[in-house]
Amino acid sequence: MNEIEKEYAKLSKKFKLPKFKEIDNEFEISTLESPSFLMRDILRKIEDKLIFYIDVIGNLVHPDASSLSNMYEVRYFSDDEKDDIYNLFKKLMKVDRNIIEVVLKNDEKEQAAFLSKVFEDWMEIKKELLKYIVKMKESWEKQSTIEEDTAYFG
């Protein structure tokens, strides 16, 4: 058992946190370098992952016109799907901003409660994300030509 896992075990006993293996599997907390501010560092690790997905789906909600990949992928989503993606984007942003707030408050009990909640929420969010990530991937399997693709962009 490494230092991170030992410190997490203490915190878990004190605050009834999710199992180390489960949270590590999702957010790779065992890669943290120091157990000194473990709760805050775990939340920051979660935030790093959220920011990545916020960027990915944010590009579907508001694609960068200079990005060929963004413009290509977005055309495979219906308006209803884009609305759902926007709602997912908002959900991710809310979690991200909550992490920032909880870290700033520096209250370990509040951080622990939030960690448990965000882990539970993440398992549902992940399912939603996967649906859109798969569709993005599948868009690249569609047959098209460079002329068709670039003509679509104007």
Which residue stretches match the model-derived regions?
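Long, low-complexity or tandemly repetitive, helically biased scaffold regions used
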Residues: 1-154
